From Swiss-Prot:
It comes from Nitrosospira multiformis (strain ATCC 25196 / NCIMB 11849 / C 71). GO terms for biological process: methylation; protein modification process; protein repair. Catalyzes the methyl esterification of L-isoaspartyl residues in peptides and proteins that result from spontaneous decomposition of normal L-aspartyl and L-asparaginyl residues. It plays a role in the repair and/or degradation of damaged proteins. PANTHER family: PROTEIN-L-ISOASPARTATE O-METHYLTRANSFERASE, PROTEIN-L-ISOASPARTATE(D-ASPARTATE) O-METHYLTRANSFERASE. Belongs to the methyltransferase superfamily. L-isoaspartyl/D-aspartyl protein methyltransferase family. InterPro entries: PCMT, SAM-dependent_MTases_sf. Coiled coil: none annotated. This is Protein-L-isoaspartate O-methyltransferase 2. It is found in: Cytoplasm. GO terms for molecular function: protein-L-isoaspartate (D-aspartate) O-methyltransferase activity. GO terms for cellular component: cytoplasm.
Length: 211
């Protein structure tokens, strides 16, 4: 259940769900999702379901990953992207397929270590990982053409808004128990926000995880 054909069927399903961006679809068929899930769950890697990855975190279902990637890309490849919440590293690997540089911040050290090994295995070398509080962003590498959050926040942290480049886009889930997917775009006059689908993500937690 981890063959190229299995991935192709996943991509066919994504097309029927409204994912039309060829660069995103190519990324989804290129990156093997089963590498990013627990071995015991590998047989479900290409089902359209979120799966647990330990530390009370999950790997998002393929449609959500593709949908957020399509919204972030918006028809053209971004130069520099910031991901808040590395998690399993799957979204990170997808972003790396169509971005010049990806910076990914994760508060849980063991997850970051696993992701580093997985990216090395796939020979993905345009990603920089950092163990830090994602709510602070990554000011030393700002501004970013795109920012994506893989955990929900009720309010957008000011630091992340400041680190978004002019004409940049941010895709994130907003809310607590009830959540919606949002897109923020920055222009010379300020910020505009578009509210989209209902979603369900783990909450964004401040600070760095301590064992």
């Amino acid at each position: 259940m981890t063959s190229q054909r299995t991935r192709a069927r996943m991509v066919e399903r994504l097309c029927t769900q409204g994912v039309t961006d060829e660069a995103v679809l190519t990324a989804m068929i290129t990156v093997p999702r089963h590498i990013f899930v627990e071995e015991v769950l590998a047989s479900r890697a290409y089902d359209d379901v979120a799966l647990p990855i330990n530390f009370e975190q999950t790997i998002s279902n393929p449609f959500t990953v593709a949908r957020m990637s399509q919204l972030l890309r918006a028809g053209s490849n971004p130069g520099k992207v910031l991901e808040i919440g590395t998690g399993s590293g799957y979204q990170t690997a997808i972003l790396a397929q169509f971005s010049r540089e990806v910076y990914s911040v994760e508060r849980i050290g063991p997850l970051l270590t696993r992701t580093r090994g997985r990216l090395r295995e796939l020979r993905i070398n345009n990603v920089r990982l950092k163990h830090a509080d994602g709510l602070l962003g990554l000011s030393e590498a700002a501004p970013f053409d795109g920012i994506i959050l893989t955990a929900a926040t009720p309010h957008m942290p000011p630091a992340l808004l400041e680190q978004l480049a002019i004409r940049g886009r941010m895709v994130f889930p907003r809310g607590t128990s009830e959540q919606v997917l949002c897109v923020i775009e920055r222009n010379l006059q300020g910020y505009t926000e578009t509210i989209l689908d209902e979603v369900k993500f783990v909450p964004m937690i401040p600070g760095i995880w301590q064992r």
